[in-house]
Amino acid sequence: MKISRQAYADMYGPTTGDRIRLGDTELWVEIEHDHTHYGEEVKFGGGKVIRDGMGQSQRCDDAVMDTVITNAVIIDWWGIIKADVGLKNGRIAAIGKSGNPDTQPDIDIIIGPGTEIIAGEGQILTAGGVDTHVHYICPQQVDEALMSGLTTMIGGGTGPATGSVATTHTPGPWHLGKMMQAVDDLPINIGFLGKGSASTPEALEQQIKAGAMSLKIHEDWGAAPASISNALDVADRYDIQVAIHADSLNESGFVQDTLEAFKDRCIHTYHTEGAGGGHAPDIIVACAMPNVLPSSTNPTRPYTINTVDEHLDMLMGCHHLDPNIPEDVAFADSRIRRETIAAEDILHDMGVISMMSSDSQAMGRIGEVVCRTWQTAHKMRVQRGLLPEDEALGADNFRAKRYIAKYTINPAITHGISHEVGSIEVGKFADLVLWKPPFFGVKPSIILKGGMIAGAAMGDPNAAISTPQPVHYRRMFGALGKAVSATRMTFVSQAAMNTGLEEKLGLKSQLVACKNVRQVRKCDMKLNDACPVLTVDPQTYEVHADGVLLTCEPATELPLAQRYHLF
């Protein structure tokens, strides 16, 4: 029996060779492989396949999956494929073909009476996003992050304290302990950055043992070469990451002095374009270093006609500056440069800037990491055409993989947690996001944390069915009660694990140590490892890569924007 491609896609979702438009962007991806066996597809519902003795076996719990996501299109850094995904004990157990091995051939994922089904037909499945630049200013950020498709937050803060509003630090053992207790029942994975701005190691070591998974150097606390070198020395001893917001004022040295202080050691450079902070006007050249792991924050993503106008007031508010003091205004002005913001777009498209993050409530928007990433990809598709890697296929597969890596696997690798999160791979924590293609990148349909549905777009709870309006994002059962602590993690250093911190603080959530951090290099950034020679003209701020001027026009209109937020 044969059916048309359209009928097949309507029933089981698209298959190999079919193309999907991502939201209302100009990005199209083509399915590279389908794990199904045509004629043996499984689907749940009345008169469908997943029924007793058909697609559902008689096998007991130890042999079957807890949950199977059927016929989903997976978009990840490693590929764009169609598959069933099996979840067991909160982790990804298998990617392949599901069903009943007693009645069907070549089954990888067994469905039984103990299996729940999530219909992925016609939907896109991605790994939960990892935001590595979060100011913990208010706990309500968690809902905004989760419902946008983020499942891991790394940052610092203690609430709306002046220091936290400006800088991503949770300083000192007392604050670290209290914040770890505070987030213990929040339905998202969290890691804390300790304050790294110090010239001697003892206070930094205290914070690492108290639960900091990384250290953060920030110019508002001091980003002199001595502080940088000291923090990296400590990080080398404890196998943790250092993140840096460098010296915008060039008080203690210029960009070359900071790069020399790194001494070829790996470091995560925040908002590497510079509008968020860093040596003016040329911090962007750090992107070219083989030891630097560069990220952007989303307020400059992508470059539009409104980007520059928005930034001045944001910057004044975040960094406790006074608009009546000329020096403060000059400081703010020095960080906002059209030329470097325009170059940032292209550096992302070239795979030079490896990561995307938010800078939540401190110039950035935590709920827009995902959509700003895809808006940037769209803008570059429109302005630069297909990437060379995509020309043979004629679809945007490589570009899609490059951009999704920026907020999933690469931040996870950078901070030593890619063994747990950051991609859809067997053995990893089942932090997954399901999207309907028209809403891809802006409004997910279901968010799973540790294999359990934690958030979803849900209709009126008093309605006869689940879809009537008003439909908005609500916490689901995975975000309630004791299920929360069973489906989330707090990331710490191995040194903190060795102190018995979990018992000492009375934590219910699992503590997981970051690892293999200090060996990470730019070449480890998936699909985003380019290191061209970058220069910045000190007078015009023009950016060149290998001698080629990087410039583009600001966007006047973007996808994934107002048409999705009318209600």
From Swiss-Prot:
The keyword DNA damage does not apply. It holds the Pfam family Amidohydro_1. Residues 128-567 form the Urease domain. GO terms for biological process: urea catabolic process. Keywords: Cytoplasm, Hydrolase, Metal-binding, Nickel. Ni(2+) 1 binds at residues 133, 135, 216, 359. Signal peptide: none annotated. PROSITE patterns: UREASE_1 (PS01120), UREASE_3 (PS51368). Its EC number is 3.5.1.5. It is found in: Cytoplasm. GO terms for cellular component: cytoplasm. NCBIfam families: PRK13206.1 (NF009685), PRK13207.1 (NF009686), urease_alph (TIGR01792). Heterotrimer of UreA (gamma), UreB (beta) and UreC (alpha) subunits. Three heterotrimers associate to form the active enzyme. This is Urease subunit alpha. It comes from Pseudoalteromonas translucida (strain TAC 125). The lineage of its organism: Bacteria, Pseudomonadati, Pseudomonadota, Gammaproteobacteria, Alteromonadales.
